[in-house]
Amino acid sequence: MKLPIYLDYSATCPVDPRVAEKMVQYMTMDGTFGNPASRSHRYGWQAEEAVDTAREQIAALLNADPREIVFTSGATESDNLAIKGVAHFYNKQGKHIITSKTEHKAVLDTMRQLEREGFEVTYLDPESNGLIDLAKLEAAMRDDTILVSIMHVNNEIGVVQDIAAIGELCRSRKVVFHVDAAQSAGKVAIDVQEMKVDLISLSAHKAYGPKGIGALYVRRKPRIRLEAQMHGGGHERGFRSGTLPTHQIVGMGEAFRIAKEELQQDYDHALKLRNRLLDGIKDMEAVTINGDLDQRVPHNLNVSFAFVEGESLLMALKDLAVSSGSACTSASLEPSYVLRALGLNDELAHSSIRFSFGRFTTEAEIDYAIELIRVAVDKLRAMSPLWDMYKDGVDLNTVEWAHH
């Protein structure tokens, strides 16, 4: 067993060996290394052909038209292009946007930037299970609302939003609907026709592809217009200039092809591992599972261990590669804004750990993880005076702490 055990698939996945093997064929003199935009010779044509194939593979996972796929450097860029692109193109129709407080930072910080430019953003509170209440979303809509941006699967707690219902609502109100699907592509089925989504952000490295490549799905019927954020040679139908990195695109295409073929298999494997981990820790005292347990992807389990400091637990679990919060914000010691939005207090939010697993995780690794978690939590609680008070029946919420 390789230590530390990797249980942080929500941060990134290892590249599938089949993907890596394919990518290597598009880099050297022996392979297809040409520029897909070179129209005057075979090197360019072959590279363009490889890009077209990848576009088809990515579109197939979404039930989309390959012409609706725009390549970007990743989901962060896709979020920026979608949100700023719509805001700047449709600002004559209105300047109001709706999103939720539990979105990824790539969405929230893009919204903050638009607020500085004079747009008005409504941030919806999720319910305590992490899901968005449709009635609240509808109530927030106004005549000048031009865009709704809601993620499909949350990166910290793994809950799955009812995208089809939100899409139906947005379509009936003629509001553009953007979805960040970085954490759902390859984990749950996505059908852009059924879901009535206008824009979808995708990432390769959350689906066993390489880092540094992503895509934005841009609907053609009804056509969605965007203002480009990256200017240059007019690549990607003018939406996103820059030479296409053939090897990365081929990697993303192959990763999405495998994801489509093995979707059910991957899902069942993750579910088996999730249930095994849950069964191994659910009899522990004062343990909370964060987020809805039914409407969620099985690849993620976010757990709060009361009376244990999250950072200490991470250190005690040095043989497990896990995270508290998401990799994008874990450099800060602030408690997770996602968990705070669910109504968790600071202490509980601070004591949460995200376990995320995937294609290459084994049952033996989960069993070893359970053993380590139980020992570490018991050891840390044994050192905590708060745990003693809790065990003695003291309601810690009623204690008035002296500030000094």
UniProtKB/Swiss-Prot annotation:
Q: Which reaction does it catalyse?
A: (sulfur carrier)-H + L-cysteine = (sulfur carrier)-SH + L-alanine
Q: What is this protein called?
A: Cysteine desulfurase IscS
Which residues catalyse the reaction?
A: 328
Q: How does it assemble?
A: Homodimer. Forms a heterotetramer with IscU, interacts with other sulfur acceptors.
- Cross-referenced InterPro entries: Aminotrans_V_dom, Aminotrans_V_PyrdxlP_BS, Cys_deSase_IscS, Cysteine_dSase, PyrdxlP-dep_Trfase, PyrdxlP-dep_Trfase_major, PyrdxlP-dep_Trfase_small
| UniProt GO BP | [2Fe-2S] cluster assembly
Q: Which organism is it from?
A: Vibrio cholerae serotype O1 (strain M66-2)
This protein's GO CC annotations: L-cysteine desulfurase complex
Q: Where in the cell is it found?
A: Cytoplasm
Output the Gene Ontology terms for molecular function: 2 iron, 2 sulfur cluster binding; cysteine desulfurase activity; metal ion binding; pyridoxal phosphate binding
Q: What is its main location?
A: cytoplasm
Which Gene3D superfamilies did the record assign?
Aspartate Aminotransferase, domain 1, Type I PLP-dependent aspartate aminotransferase-like (Major domain)
* Entry's family note: Belongs to the class-V pyridoxal-phosphate-dependent aminotransferase family. NifS/IscS subfamily.
Is Endoplasmic reticulum one of the keywords? no
Q: What keywords would UniProt list here?
A: 2Fe-2S, Cytoplasm, Iron, Iron-sulfur, Metal-binding, Pyridoxal phosphate, Transferase
Its cofactor is: pyridoxal 5'-phosphate
The function of this protein is: Master enzyme that delivers sulfur to a number of partners involved in Fe-S cluster assembly, tRNA modification or cofactor biosynthesis. Catalyzes the removal of elemental sulfur atoms from cysteine to produce alanine. Functions as a sulfur delivery protein for Fe-S cluster synthesis onto IscU, an Fe-S scaffold assembly protein, as well as other S acceptor proteins.
What are the N6-(pyridoxal phosphate)lysine sites (modified residues) in this protein?
Answer: 206
Q: Name one Pfam family in it.
A: Aminotran_5
Residues where [2Fe-2S] cluster binds: 328
Q: Which residues does pyridoxal 5'-phosphate bind?
A: 75-76, 155, 183, 203-205, 243
Q: What is its EC number?
A: 2.8.1.7
Task: Describe which pathway this protein belongs to, using the record's wording.
Answer: Cofactor biosynthesis; iron-sulfur cluster biosynthesis
